[in-house]
Amino acid sequence: MVDKKVDKKPVPEDWPHIVGDYVVGDAESPVAVVTLGSHMEDEPVRAGAAISGPLHTENLGIEKVVGNVIANPNLRFLLVCGAEVMGHITGQTMKALHSNGVDGETGRIIGATGAIPYIENMPDEAIERFRRQVELVDMVDVEDPAAIRERIGECVVHDSGAIDEEPLILRPSEDLNKNKPDENT
């Protein structure tokens, strides 16, 4: 296989700047992995992901993921895998956010079935940037490390390069960084 060169952008020195329960790999990788209710340690990062961690809540947790993704323009795929979180339904909510966005008046993620699917701490431009920047790879309820590694590898091969926009850095509110700072990638 021939290595192809794709354009990459510098990543802010403090990336990922929103605290959470995640492992960081090569910031130039095009893949971010959300493992939902499953803890896969550093397996996705060892397979080539830039960042990986669980996602337990469909509101602040998703805001943290979005904030860290849009701060790294090299991320072009969001692989959503692992066991769905009962009640919060974070996998379905992330898919709804990516497909449908957010109701501009209520902040509710359109089409989400989770208990509290509201985005309250992010501007619309951040959500739209997230939706443009990454392709969502749906592996909800898949926990097989070999299948996840294979999919990460496929994403790396199909890397189209960084989005032609600068990093979008949102400084988190007190809610995002103080409430359960080590949870919700």
From Swiss-Prot:
Compartment annotation: Cell membrane
Gene behind this protein: mtrA2
Keyword Transmembrane helix listed: yes
Family label: Belongs to the MtrA family.
Pathway: One-carbon metabolism; methanogenesis from CO(2); methyl-coenzyme M from 5,10-methylene-5,6,7,8-tetrahydromethanopterin: step 2/2
Protein name according to UniProt: Tetrahydromethanopterin S-methyltransferase subunit A 2
GO cellular component, one term: plasma membrane
GO terms under biological process: methanogenesis, from carbon dioxide; methylation; one-carbon metabolic process
Record EC number: 7.2.1.4
Top-level taxon: Archaea
